[in-house]
Amino acid sequence: MRIAVICFCLLGIASALPVKPTSSGSSEEKQLNNKYPDAVATWLKPDPSQKQTFLAPQNSVSSEETDDNKQNTLPSKSNESPEQTDDLDDDDDNSQDVNSNDSDDAETTDDPDHSDESHHSDESDEVDFPTDIPTIAVFTPFIPTESANDGRGDSVAYGLKSRSKKFRRSNVQSPDATEEDFTSHIESEEMHDAPKKTSQLTDHSKETNSSELSKELTPKAKDKNKHSNLIESQENSKLSQEFHSLEDKLDLDHKSEEDKHLKIRISHELDSASSEVN
């Protein structure tokens, strides 16, 4: 305890002592201060007029900055018209009302009767959309007309029957018609049926011509095939003969070469035997 008390006393004494400011100047500056104290004092303490000249541009710059800040802040406030502020207030009120309504709805949903009513209302709000009904293609059977005689074997007889029916109907429908009208009607129908008959005849003639041409072409094609087969067989026989002749020649040449080799060997053996005898 004594040591602690002594330490506190020393700290209090040290804090009570005056602190001398350290001179940050160099030794040359200290010498100048000692030699010319008045000149240094006047240099360190300039005239108030000089201070004002130095401070004037700084004050102008600071005033310009403050003016700019004020101008930037003022438009944001001025742009907000009283109507906009009123709208903002109304929005806040509406949001509060909505929140209150939500809370009321949450309270009322706890009632079973209310839940049933809401369910029925939701079902009534639903709209029944029509379902896609598959479209059925209606097939209309082909009803041949009276003048349609194509595709029948008895087209001529059928045409005569249809004409007689037409004439009977025309007589019944117009009993007052004259013979000239009747003849003109027949002529017009004949003119109308003439191109059909000619087309049928041309088709039949084309079919007959095509059948005749096909009959004529088939034997010619057969003859050509036979002739080509004969030529190929002759060429094959010639080639086979030439091949056999070449084989025979090669065999003869090979045999003659073997005979020559044998003769040479025999002559060499005889020479060697005669030399040994000598």
UniProtKB/Swiss-Prot annotation:
UniProt modified residues of type Phosphothreonine: 66, 178, 183, 208
Biased amino acid composition, Acidic residues: 83-95
Post-translational modification, as annotated: Extensively phosphorylated by FAM20C in the extracellular medium at multiple sites within the S-x-E/pS motif. The phosphorylated form inhibits hydroxyapatite crystallization. Dephosphorylation via a mechanism involving ALPL/TNAP promotes hydroxyapatite crystallization. Forms covalent cross-links mediated by transglutaminase TGM2, between a glutamine and the epsilon-amino group of a lysine residue, forming homopolymers and heteropolymers, increasing its collagen binding properties.
Keyword Glycoprotein tagged: yes
Annotated Polar residues bias: 49-63, 71-82, 228-243
Residues the record lists as Phosphoserine modifications: 23-24, 26-27, 60, 62-63, 76, 78, 81, 95, 100, 103, 115, 118, 121, 124, 184, 188, 199, 205, 210, 214, 228, 233, 237, 240, 245, 256, 267, 272, 274-275
Positions occupied by motif Cell attachment site: 152-154
Glycosylation site positions: 131, 140, 145, 205, 272
Tissue expression from the record: Bone, inner ear, kidney, uterus, lung, brain, epidermis.
Site entry: Not glycosylated: 79, 101, 209
One example of a Gene Ontology biological process annotation: osteoblast differentiation
Principal subcellular localisation of the protein: secreted
Keyword Phosphoprotein appears in the UniProt entry: yes
Keywords for this protein: Biomineralization, Cell adhesion, Cytokine, Glycoprotein, Phosphoprotein, Proteoglycan, Secreted, Sialic acid, Signal
Residues in the signal sequence: 1-16
Region (Disordered): 38-278
A GO CC term assigned to this protein in UniProt: extracellular space
Annotated GO MF terms: cytokine activity; extracellular matrix binding; integrin binding
Family to which this protein belongs: Belongs to the osteopontin family.
Quaternary assembly: Interacts (via N-terminus) with integrin ITGA9:ITGB1.
Name of this protein: Osteopontin
Organism expressing this protein natively: Bos taurus (Bovine)
Phylogenetic classification of the source organism: Eukaryota, Metazoa, Chordata, Craniata, Vertebrata
